[in-house]
Amino acid sequence: MTEDWQSQKFRQNVISKIHDLLPPNAQDQTKNAGVMENHIFRKSRTKDEYLGLVAKLFMHYKDMSRKSQQQQQQQQQQGGPPPNAEMGGGQNMMQDPLNALQNLASQGNRNPQMMPMGAGGGAPVPGGPGTASNLLQSLNQQRPGQQQMQPMSNIRGQMPMGAGGAGAQQMMQVQQMQQGGNAPGVMNVMGAGGGQNQGQIVGNPGQQMGVGVGMPNQMVGPGPNSGPAVGGAGGPNAAPGAGGPGPNQMQGGPMNVNAMQQMPPMQQIQQNQLGMGMNPMMRMGQGNGMGGPQGMPGQGMQGMPQGPHNVVGGPAGQQQVGGAGLPPNAVQQGGMNPMGGMGVNMPPNLQQKPNMPMGQAGQMFPGNRGGVGVGGQQPGQPFMRSSPSPADAQQLQQQAQLQQMQQQQQQLVVGNQTPTQQPPTPQMPTPNMIPSPALVPQSSPQMMQMQNSQRNIRQQSPSASINTPGQVTGNSPFNPQEEALYREKYKQLTKYIEPLKRMLAKISNDGTNVEKMTKMSKLLEILCNPTQRVPLETLLKCEKALEKMDLISYSGQQFGKSSNPLLEVINTTLQSPVANHTLYRTFRPTLELLFGTDITAPVPAKRPRVEEKSTSFEQEVPHVLQGEIARLDTKFKVKLDTTSQINNKAIRLICCLDDKRLPSVPPVSVSVPEEYPWQAPDCSLAEQEYSATPFLQTVQQALIARISKLPKNYSLSHLLDTWEMAVRQACSPQSKPRAVCELSTLLGV
């Protein structure tokens, strides 16, 4: 019964419960519920883990519903905009259920120790402060084997909001987490509608680095022995005055990479990214997270390897913050995907990985309009989390529609749009242009390849899809399963590229069938350009069309694809009907020179032909008899009597009379002696045949009488003529035949 949780019936029941739990305004609830359940199933090894993750999901949605009601009440009391107001549009973002689920699933692989958190106040901000509540409080529930979590209170982060392009400088409250040992850096980010914002990472004061994010930001790299250096309003957190550091200005020297590498792995920091219009539950994969007891699952700040790329948002290390006058497609750092209608792609190392613990990376939350908060660390300061809550269903539906319209408009005007209320800074010619990665100091290869031994999660290179200026793209319409299927199908169709090129070359040379050439050109363009994404159905149609085509005749080969001309010529020759003859004629002389001629067996000796013994007839029939038979009249039919040729040297012939003017009579047997023609042949009649009728008896008597009157030596021809005259005499109308004399016999009358 322990394996019944893997059955389809059990899983379908869980999917239906998740489906009922989802908000009624969520789009495509069936798909989202199925995707979340499938993700939990793949992450779970036992039934307890499976049920535990499902229970956490239920608690998460219930907690979100409760906090949504609390935030709506706070908004009504304060009269300010919702904390998840989007830049340029002020639209609420709906949480991605799959991202929330991935954050929940990470709880099964973490054993963190929660540090005490207090409440920190923020300075009042003109225009009304924004509120941020705890989003994933349910994730902090204690699991078996985890240590008890300290109490935590909600912290209201003061999000600066400019008043339509005002030049006021605002500062966001510091987000911190206590850790023992060396003091990690603290990053403060200030955002205003149109003014300058300054963010500082306070660590080693002698190591500072400016990062161009469209506003002059200062960053101080953390040092191993640096103490806490957080001042008041006039300290390091103060906004720069006239003559302050310019954008992208290096202060002091480069970051001390060795110092960062020397920091203990348990003292790792990771920033919280607050992107305008970003999906609240989007996770930024910054590499290998911290798996020690000081990791904080579900919080806004998680463990991260100490590396050079741990500077303001990942490898690219830049974040651009636009005020109220900027277009709604506020550019995020390093090609991060806002997932909420922004035309920016997220590189693979920032995407969600199913095998990465979800609590490992930082969370991205939408803050107040015009402000971005980046979490850091500082001893002695309370920890703050920014957590939005979804608004009512009506607003969410309107937001989704407006975001789609804005995304389409942004993609059309990207690269040539100018700001309406805030002039562009020198670092960013146009507000919707993504800063190039070349502007940010690159991290060393050793730090990029550093892995956490407790997690052993590989960090992907961001070079595959880092966006450069003018290369802003939209969100990918494929989920991971469809993406893998699309790439596999595209890889299978690449074998048709060379045959298609040859077919197009042949058709273009012929100058006929222009329509077919156009279709082939479109197919070739789809196959040769991997960046041109087409629907998977279109790719399947292309595969069917390519399978129906006779590409073998154009490819010149039926197996394999080779770039060697010699192999192609040999393959073409082998397909010829005279291939064997061609190979024999081509290679036989060479093989004979190399190996010599083949040693064959000796020719057998000629044996004399054994002559067959001829019959006695062939030996004894003289030519005189053969000539006489050949000259007989056609009415006489003569053939050999083979039955009497064994022991008798005489030749026995059977003679038939075939004359249409005479009646049919039985044949006679003639025996030709060996001494013929010097000895007369002998004629014998069959007694039974010639005594059958009176007519035949008359023929027999007449023949005997005539033979008796013949001379001593007569020939075969004379004997046959006598037989004919005997038949004629028997046919005479005279009843009594005349006496035959010798003269009449000789004359044949």
Swiss-Prot record:
The protein, known as: Mediator of RNA polymerase II transcription subunit 15
PANTHER family: MEDIATOR OF RNA POLYMERASE II TRANSCRIPTION SUBUNIT 15
Gene Ontology molecular function: transcription coregulator activity
InterPro entries: KIX_dom_sf, Med15_C, Med15_central, Med15_N
Major site of localization recorded for this protein: nucleus
Protein family (similarity comment): Belongs to the Mediator complex subunit 15 family.
Composition bias, Gly residues: 229-246, 368-378
Low complexity bias (residue ranges): 69-78, 393-420, 441-463
Top-level lineage group: Eukaryota
A GO CC term assigned to this protein in UniProt: nucleus
Keywords annotated in UniProt: Activator, Nucleus, Transcription, Transcription regulation
UniProt KW Transcription keyword: yes
Lineage of origin: Eukaryota, Metazoa, Ecdysozoa, Arthropoda, Hexapoda
Pro residues compositional bias, start-end: 421-434
Biased composition (Polar residues): 464-479
Pfam family, one: Med15_N
Gene designation: MED15
Keyword Cytoplasm in record: no
Summary of subunit composition and partner proteins: Component of the Mediator complex.
